Design a protein with these regions (language model features):
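Hydrophobic transmembrane-helix bundles of small-molecule transporters
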Residues: 171-289, 296, 314, 321, ...
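Transmembrane core module of solute transporters
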Residues: 20-73, 114, 217, 239-410, ...
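Small-residue-rich alpha-helical segments with characteristic i,i+4
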Residues: 128, 145-156, 300, 306, ...
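Transmembrane-helix exit segments and adjacent C-terminal regions of multi-pass membrane proteins
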Residues: 1-24, 28, 262, 462-605
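Helix-loop-helix hairpins in multi-pass membrane proteins, especially solute transporters
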Residues: 81-218, 244, 328
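Juxtamembrane helix-start motifs in multi-pass secondary transporters
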Residues: 86-92, 349-351, 521
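Small-residue (Gly/Pro/Ala) motifs that create kinks and tight helix-helix packing interfaces
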Residues: 46, 161-170, 305, 337, ...
């Protein structure tokens, strides 16, 4: 009885104190700050970078390369962290991200920058997935809402500081003899070193190592499946969607998907993404919703800053601040929904409301035009932010709650992985659609009577002709007379910095054409989010657990110890009743030596 009591006392002791949890969260926030700050800095500075490196048309490669590698790396980090612990993998992720940042800061062209951004993505995959997995380890599902404010504060701070820093760097010619925009990447180094120091000092999470094979074949098949499909999404408009190269990409991608499914089935529990997870209807539906919402979320976050800079003439810094309605909407709805979930344990309604608000926001964007004020776009951003705040954490929470404690890491990374797939596809497809539409929409804008009248008036104005700011656009107009509006539209695939400084009458057809092309991608996003809205009604909400993964593991161990002790005591008691001796802890009965001897027959007289 004494032994049983001891086991119970140890198991009921707190796994982590509140102070320890806070220090762990500080370490996680440092890593997440590094990742979120990088995204806001790069996003608002991309136009300046693309103009300087003469490659706006391939800027999608810079974004897509980052998303491809971060997407592929995400489930690998999740599986390896289940095997070797979260801490070493999180440290590796930060280190890789810093190396990629240093290399990106010295890129000489857009292709080189895309390659180094891909290296950054290998680290970012861990920075995005592991904090959520660690939160799943140390906090019960209903308790996590109490700590969401810390992470939202980090996200909000980086969202405000990032555009400001990015705009200052992008607008500076040189800082310490280095091009200003290069500091967009180099600034990660001091921040990353500080984050690494915090993680090394405070991030210590209990871990039980499991001997499971690493699914390298699964990782290889993911690469084979994703890369060609994303390449054709980016290059399809130039190759032709039915060209030989496009068909080859479709075929290789399909074979990769088939190979991945077969590999995961053969690997069983050791799979990169165990297929047993999809036996849960909650996990399966949350995964589908994550893909669709990721498509809309990343598409919006990457295209809206470009729209604000090109059409509304905002600087990179201004475009970052103009995105604040989306960030504020996300914070408000996330905090509110998190507190409600923590108190009630119910979450089914939030994906429904969230996707509905996102759909309303994208529908709002379909009315965008070159003559609409900036505040019009801010209204749509607020709606999208209010929707996102109710969806993202809720879907992750549902995925984590649908699996056992041992699968928290792989479930979290899988949830992030599929959301990243949606985001990667969204960016590649939406940018492809955008630049495919631009030549046609600009050609149509040049046929507008008001635009033609403005061009004619500007062409007869001596001041306009003499102003050096108009030289680039006048040259394009002169060269475009032979090729028509479509050839003029191709000019937006390169340097666009001349548009905001040119005479408004000369720039009007270009800006109107770009705005109309952007409306097309918002219709596409709206269609995708509406599908998510309909599917969200079918998300089965399972009751939230009251214990964290670590507490459940400790409880399971306590139960196992008690069962073993009870079995041993029962065997001892039974042996005592039989007058036998029992070897302690085994439950086996040791019979006296005399009882094992064969009795000798009696001699008859």
């Amino acid at each position: 009885v004494t032994n049983t009591s001891t086991v119970s006392q140890n198991a009921d002791a707190p796994i982590l104190t509140h102070r320890q949890i806070l220090f762990i969260i500080f370490g996680l926030m440092a890593g997440m700050f590094l990742s979120s700050l990088d995204q806001t800095i790069v996003g608002t500075s991309m136009r300046t970078i693309a103009d300087d490196l003469h490659g706006l048309s391939i800027q999608a490669w810079v974004t897509t390369a980052y998303l491809i590698t971060s997407t592929i790396a995400t489930p690998i980090y999740g599986k390896l962290s289940d095997l070797f612990g979260r801490r070493p993998l999180f440290i590796i992720a930060i280190s890789i991200f810093l190396i990629g940042s240093l290399a990106a800061g010295f890129a000489q062209d857009m292709y080189m920058l895309a390659g180094f951004r891909a290296l950054q993505g290998l680290g970012a995959g861990g920075l995005m997935a592991l904090p959520l997995a660690i939160m799943g380890d140390i906090l019960a599902p209903r308790e996590r809402a109490k700590y969401q404010g810390y992470f939202l504060a980090v996200f909000a701070t980086s969202s405000v500081i990032g555009p400001l820093i990015g705009g200052l760097f992008a607008g500076a010619d040189q800082i310490l003899f280095v091009d200003g925009w290069r500091w967009v990447f180099l600034v990660n180094l001091p921040i990353g070193v500080g984050a690494l120091a915090l993680v090394l000092r405070y991030l210590h999470v209990p871990h039980t190592r499991h001997s499971v094979r690493i699914d390298w074949w699964g990782a290889a098949s993911v690469i084979i499946a994703l890369v060609p499909l994303l390449i054709v999404a980016e290059q399809g408009r130039e190759w032709g969607w039915g060209s030989l190269g496009a068909i080859a990409c479709y075929t290789i991608g399909a074979l990769g998907i088939a190979a991945f499914i077969i590999t995961e089935k053969l690997m069983g529990d050791a799979a990169l993404i165990p297929l047993k997870l999809f036996k849960s209807s909650t996990f399966s539906m949350a995964t589908v919703l994550g893909v669709l919402v990721g498509f809309g979320m990343f598409g919006a976050m990457m295209t809206i800053p470009l729209y604000l800079q090109l059409v509304n003439g905002a600087t990179p810094t201004e475009s970052g601040f103009l995105m604040l309605p989306m960030i504020l909407g996300l914070m408000i709805s996330s905090i509110t929904s998190g507190q409600i979930i923590s108190r009630t344990g119910r979450y089914k309604i939030f994906p429904i409301i969230g996707t509905g608000l996102m759909a309303a926001g994208f529908f709002w964007f379909t009315f965008a035009s070159a003559d609409k004020p900036v505040i019009f776009m801010m209204g749509g951003m607020l709606l999208v932010g209010l929707g996102l705040g109710q969806i993202m954490q809720t879907l992750t929470l549902a995925s984590q709650n649908s699996v056992g404690p041992r699968d928290i890491g792989v479930a979290t990374s899988s949830s992030t992985f599929f959301r990243q797939i949606g985001g990667t596809a969204g960016v590649a497809i939406l940018f492809s659609v955008l630049f495919s539409r631009i030549p046609d929409t600009i050609a149509a804008a040049f046929q507008d009577k008001d635009n033609l009248a403005g061009l004619a008036a500007a062409a007869q104005d001596p001041e306009v002709l003499a102003d050096p700011k108009n030289a680039k656009i006048l040259e394009l107009l002169q060269n475009g007379q032979n090729g028509g509006g479509a050839s003029l539209g191709d000019s937006l695939n390169g340097d666009t910095s001349f548009l905001n400084s040119a005479d408004p009458r000369l720039a009007a057809p270009f800006l109107e054409g770009f705005a109309n092309a952007t409306v097309t991608i918002y219709w596409v996003s709206l269609a995708v989010v509406l599908v998510a809205f309909l599917l969200s009604f079918f998300l089965k909400a399972t009751p939230l657990r009251q214990k964290s993964a670590i507490e459940e593991a400790a409880s399971d161990k306590k139960d196992a110890d008690e069962r073993e002790l009870a079995t041993s005591l029962d065997a001892q008691h039974a042996a005592d009743l039989a007058g036998a001796l029992v070897e302690a802890g085994t439950g086996s009965i040791e019979l006296p030596e005399d009882t094992l001897r064969t009795p000798k027959p009696r001699n008859k007289r």
